[in-house]
Amino acid sequence: MEELVIPVITERFDKRLVGRYDYVIELARPEGDEWSGHDVTHIPDRRMFDIKVQPIRDAIDYKPVENDGEVLPRILDMSIACYDMRKRMMKRDGVDFVSDTKWLEWMIQDSMDVQPLKVDMKEDHSTVQYDMFSAKLHVDSRKADTTSYNILALETKEGAQCHHVHTNIWNHMIRNHLFHAVQESCYIFKPTYKLTVNSERRTPDEDFQIGNPQFLTLRRNQQIFLGDDAYKKTAKGLVQVLVNGVVPDIIRNEIAALDAIRDKWIQGNYERTHIKSLELCNLLSAIGRKMVNLEEEPKDERDLSLRFQHKLDDKFAKNDQERNVIFAQKSQRNDQDRFYVLMVIAASDTNNSRVWWSNPYPCLRGALIAAECKLGDVYYKLRSWYEWSVREGYKPRDLDRQYEKYIVGRVNLFDLEAEPGTKVLHWEYELISKLYTVSNHEGNQCDLHPDEGEIVTKFDDTRYSDMIQTIINEGWKQNDFKMFKMLKDEGNPLLYDLEKDIKLDRVSRVVFPPYFDQWTYVPMFNARIKPCEVEVGERKNIDPYVKRTHRPLKADCIELMRYHMSQYMDLRVSLQGTSLSIKQTPSSIHQSLARDASYAEILSRRRENLDYKSQCPIVTNLFLLEKFFLLIFTTMEKHYWEMDDDETEYEHPKIDPSKFEVEGTLHDVSQVMVHLFDRFFEKRRFLRTVDESRWILHLIRSASGARRLEVLSRFFPAFSDGLRIREFKKVRDIMLLNFLPFLFLTGDNIAYEHRQWAVPVIFYADKIMIIPAEVGAYYNRFGLTCILELMMFFPSYDTRNENLSEDVRACIGPIINYYLDTTISNGGIQTSIVSTKALLYETYLSSICGGFSEAILWYLPITHPSKCLIALEVSDALTSPELRIDKIKRRFPLSSNHLKGIVQISVRPGRTFSVVTQGIVKHRVCKKTLLRYRCDVILIQTPGYVFGNDELLTKLLNI
């Protein structure tokens, strides 16, 4: 066959007359002269693709379930490239080379542009129908296996110009945690408490008189608010505080639902059958999320939730001995409270310790919060009213704490409902030195004993020595080694916790920790922190980039990686608005980034036609990616073993946009990681492609032991030679070890195997040390945040040539073995969530920039005289055919030589259309009459070429 016929009909045309055609284009009704684009909010009502109308930050975590299956737009490009590799290997070796199919499997799994499609399937004539706003495409089911959408976010036509060539960069940066807004961690009086004045005294030396309260300047039962006069006196220890529970408005409905379950349980003679543990868990999870973090990262609560449900069943059983103690008749006890008492005991047993607001599991902290609404300070009341004590198997400190009351809880400033002027407690976090004045000769070794600082964090020599001995004897213990264990308890910021350290003592007097309102200097992290009062300056905003307090943490997405102690901040993806909108305003982060003094200079590195004033999200993300590259290379250059002995002083790590120029264009974080080794150890300036870089990292991560070393030797021979030396004698010999974490910590489609663990890092201070850098899901430690600021310290020229100490030398073998065996990034990911967001981001981008343009793309195989493809696309006419053809070609980065022809059909608002062809394809548009119906037909010809059969693509996809 050398000719293909595609009828173009209207909705009035009887489709039975064209049911035998392989492809039919059905035009939608004509639209008016005022037509300006598509209303994408109607996508959920059409058979297009699975995007819901929801807040954009919810949408990026949405699991597509309302669809008929998924399609991978680049599957043909990958399959053909794999076929070519297979063919070449057979010619060279005479046998199949097994890794090419493994490569294809990996490419499919690694893809981030999977499309969850909603289609109509017509059983009467076996066709699949794909909807667009401008037309419908009917495809014979035998030929529908490669059909996909090819939508475009149009570039704005006014003001600064967009650059929508590589729009996947936005999704990529977000998945790598490189597009986040930040708010400092914040604490308030628990909104589940009403704190009132119970008594007052003149000086802290006086005793509060039991049974004879006095009120000097305050009123009896006067409520205490952060920042008011009552609070100021409370902070000075002059007020005895009474704690009562209260229900915050935000969870009033959930508490009412719990009360209804409670009342039914009481009326039903306390039978356990009235306690639906799953229902309770769901309500408590909702409370936990609403009160602490509405958009926390999803955690796999399934196992813990089941344990909690079993504990609830046990605790509400009538034969439970502890329940019977709770039910003993004593004054102040009542059935209404007993319900919440049993619930929080079950939560505590599930957690095997006291539950706090900061508990990572919403259902457990929800149980605590719900109980606080009724009981006030839960554990104090359990001990004093219900004679229940925390178990001896809990943490030892929990036993002491049940005699005290804890009145502050951590809240998320992104969600906090607070008016300007409201007082809160927050953590101020600053870098001690944003830029160091250094020289190559002197290096930048950490000063662990700074002159300034009210409180200074210090290493504990005994604990450090114990860790070193463990490494020598047993190897690197990634689950056991913790940085907080390496520091002295006094002034240890990794042990600070305002929720646990601000309390009411046994006489209900407020006690603040000694570090409150004091700067703690943490030289090993180049940080100083201080908890103090601050005023809220902005109301809650839909834009997460808006700073809430008068003294916020200020850093852009890349600079944030230098703030090592992530527990003192909260992060949120810097997106605002909804998933589907015709026009909306983006987050102000783009304006802020475009004002960066180095914006134009950094973007100029790309040697692309960019508008250096553009606030287009794609341009700002390209800026961030280039800045990320420069910061990593500026930092790690000093960890390469070779360095000139130069006494010239300079600022470090000051970014110089003219440095580290490459041959090639940067599109992916994986390119940065791979080029680190190429640049410094292999002396290559050429930037590997995205696919090659991701493949290299995959091979390294999926191998282990000697096999991993072989993979390193294959791609980075000079680096691997450095790992193979027989004896590490000098400091310079071990400097390459700090490059190893970069192979494992980043990725847009990975999840860490462990929730929290530590990797070894060489640390340069007055002596060479080995320290555990903590990685994991807690405290936002994803990517390079866990190690980057530690890398700001590097040895002097003389230190590089010094002999290693015996203890460090003895640890190098175990450290190398750890990095050759570790499987950091082998955690399970929700592939259907991670890989299906390309359509979402393109649609969201269209609402910010120039609008939404749609297309459907499919392919036909050519079998003779050479095997190749032609692409066919039907689209709206909102952009030029030339741009659309360029977009089609970009789907074939690996096998573009096999795409021999393109047919591009553009449908105008008035429902006329035009056809453009390229390559081996020619076309004619003719009129066709069938009975009383008349339509257009597009005759597509490939002179000298023969179309392949229906299953040629199937065979290709199953090589």
Curated annotation (Swiss-Prot):
The keyword Mitochondrion is annotated on this UniProt entry: no
Family matches, as InterPro entries: Capsid_VP2_Orbivir
Pfam families registered for this protein in UniProt: Orbi_VP2
Recorded GO CC terms: viral inner capsid
Locations listed in the record: Virion
Record's keyword terms, sorted: Capsid protein, Clathrin-mediated endocytosis of virus by host, Host-virus interaction, Inner capsid protein, Viral attachment to host cell, Viral penetration into host cytoplasm, Virion, Virus endocytosis by host, Virus entry into host cell
Signal peptide residues on this chain, from the entry's feature table: none
MF-aspect GO terms: structural molecule activity
GO-annotated biological processes: clathrin-dependent endocytosis of virus by host cell; virion attachment to host cell
Family, per entry: Belongs to the orbivirus VP2 family.
Its biological purpose: The VP2 protein is one of the two proteins (with VP5) which constitute the virus particle outer capsid. It is the major target of the host immunogenic response. Responsible for viral attachment to target host cell, probably by binding to sialic acid. This attachment induces virion internalization predominantly through clathrin-dependent endocytosis.
Name of protein: Outer capsid protein VP2
Species of the source: Bluetongue virus 13 (isolate USA)
Lineage: Viruses, Riboviria, Orthornavirae, Duplornaviricota, Resentoviricetes
